[in-house]
């Protein structure tokens, strides 16, 4: 009986320790996210920077927290499997550049909005959801950042990486996937890459 009691107590201790680690991980990620936001806000408010320099600094600051490569892969769905390595590399490069330009332009339009973290929690194994409100005088936008933890660390990247962003319930990744799927029903992947080059 005493042996069973000890095993139960050990199991409880392990569970409490695991919960403590999980809470610490969520807290660390939340603080890291807010630190990044503060960093970007300082860049945006720096009037000594030209627009190109400002956007370059924004991209440099945000890139380590995004898994643009995974986003590129997921956006193509089954078409990804049909590509050789050279075409995969080319598409990823074009997609990453497109995403960087999109994020820098959106952030560059910042006008004293306030970012508030409303919730952060594990959604499933190696997945975390961080929900925020972007508060301005006119409106409040709910923006959700979805993180995953790569099995292997990626050079010059954070441990937890954003692989999708939802703005007012609309997933950027799903929107890209739907757009690319419709395009590829009548055109080739090479024509899609030509369009991305033109942008």
Name every feature range the model reports, one short phrase each.
Residues 1-9:
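Bacterial N-terminal signal peptides that target proteins for export
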Residues 142, 147-175:
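Short beta-strand edge/turn micro-motifs at domain boundaries
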Residues 164-199:
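Low-complexity, intrinsically disordered terminal/linker segments enriched in charged
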Residues 101-141, 199:
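Surface-exposed, charged secondary-structure patches
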Residues 8, 17-25:
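Sec/Tat signal peptide C-region and signal peptidase I cleavage site
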Residues 77, 109-114, 182-184:
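Juxtamembrane/interface motifs at transmembrane-helix termini
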């Amino acid at each position: 009986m005493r042996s069973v009691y000890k095993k139960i107590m050990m199991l409880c201790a392990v569970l409490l320790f695991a919960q403590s680690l999980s809470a610490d991980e969520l807290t660390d990620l939340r603080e890291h996210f807010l630190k990044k936001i503060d960093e970007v806000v300082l860049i945006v408010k720096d009037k000594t920077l030209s627009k190109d320099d400002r956007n370059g600094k924004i991209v440099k600051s945000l890139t380590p927290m995004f898994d643009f490569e995974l986003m590129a892969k997921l956006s193509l769905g089954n078409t990804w499997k049909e590509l050789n390595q050279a075409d995969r590399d080319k598409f990823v490069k074009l997609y990453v550049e497109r995403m960087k330009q999109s994020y820098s332009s959106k952030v560059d339009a910042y006008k004293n909005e306030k970012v508030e973290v409303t919730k952060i929690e594990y959604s499933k194994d190696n997945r975390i959801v961080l929900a925020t409100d972007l508060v301005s005088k006119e409106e409040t936008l709910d923006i959700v950042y979805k993180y995953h933890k790569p099995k292997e660390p990626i050079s010059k990247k954070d441990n937890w990486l954003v692989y999708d962003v939802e703005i007012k319930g609309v997933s950027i990744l799903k929107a890209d996937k739907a757009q690319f799927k419709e395009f590829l029903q009548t055109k080739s992947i090479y024509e899609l890459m030509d369009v991305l080059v033109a942008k």
